[in-house]
Every structure is written in structure tokens, then in C-alpha cells.
Amino acid sequence: ERWMECTLPIGLVLLEGGVIGVIASKVFQVEPWVLALISAAPMFANLSSFLWNKLSLAKKKVQFASYLQLGVLICLLIVALSPVIQLGVVMLVTSMIASRILLAGFVTVRSVVWSLNYARDIRGQATGQLQMIASVVSIIISASIGPYLDYISTNIAIIYIIGAIAGVLGILFLGR
């Protein structure tokens, strides 16, 4: 799981509202209401946790979590392929919202996996270490992407493809 936490956040950071918001504003030059929708996406996603709990019942949790991660990676690739036209804005925003909903499902299922993998008395410490790794990776990637986004005009595809490749590694590490 530690290796997954080193790789998966690379792709997840690229779908955060702040990053997508900058891309939507600078590259796609969207209206303010679109930026508001992007900012609200995580709140929509949090409401889906109840649904994910029901959908994952009687399913293999690690496999289910891997499918959710794969869905997030597909969203990354859709962003990479989004043309800088109105259709691209729809692809960008839809992918961002879908990825947040899928990520909410992943977080919901992952908590069940953690409860099965770690004894109650060490679970907090173990999951805290995993989250610390993910946070450090997220900070490093966010700090690295900022300057890149300042200097690009429309060439965002490469960073999203790299994020998707890192995410595939995360799926492989989770399945081990």
C-alpha cells in the first residue's frame, strides 16, 4: 500500500479543483460559473459515499477499489485528450466531477480494506503513515505542476498522461 500511496496521488492531484480550475481558466478561458462548478465537485462527490457502500457489498474490496482507480485514470486521459474548444470544457469538467465521485468510492472502499488489513490498535498509526506519504507526494506534485502551468498555453496532455501512467502503477501496487 505504501508504494500505491507514492504513485496514485500523482494522478489524483491533477484532478483536484485547484489544478483543474487553473487549466479551465488559463487554457479554456471558462466563465466564472464553470469555476464555481469545479470548486463544488468534491462536495457532490462526498454525497455519493452512501451509494458506494451499497455498491461494494458482497464484492472483493481490493478488486472493486482497483476498478474505481481505473475509472479515475480514464478521467485523467479524457482531460489529456480534451480539445481547447467548448466540447473540451465539457470533457474537462465532466471528467473532473466523475473522478471526484469515483475517488469518493475509492476512499469509502479503502476504509473497509484498512479495517480488514490492520488490527484496531494499530490501524490509526498505519493509515496515518499511508496518508502522510500521499500528502507529501501531493505537495511535491502540486508544487511542481504550478510553474509548468504558468508557462504552457494548451499543452496539458503530457502531464495528464504521466499522471495516468503513475496511477496504473498504483493500481498494480494495490493489487499485490
Positions of the model-derived regions?
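Helix-loop boundary and gating motifs at the non-cytosolic
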Residues: 1-53
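Hydrophobic core of transmembrane alpha-helices in multi-pass small-molecule transporters
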Residues: 6, 75, 87-106
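Intracellular juxtamembrane helix-capping segments at the cytosolic ends
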Residues: 20, 103-118
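Glycine-rich segments within core transmembrane alpha-helices of 12-TM secondary carriers
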Residues: 42-49, 127-146
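Helix-to-loop junctions at the C-terminal end of transmembrane segments
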Residues: 47-63, 145, 149-150
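Cytoplasmic membrane-interface "Motif A"-like loop-to-helix N-cap segments
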Residues: 57-72, 153-155
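C-terminal ends and interior cores of transmembrane alpha-helices
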Residues: 69-87, 147-150
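C-terminal membrane-cytosol helix-exit motif in multi-pass small-molecule transporters
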Residues: 164-176
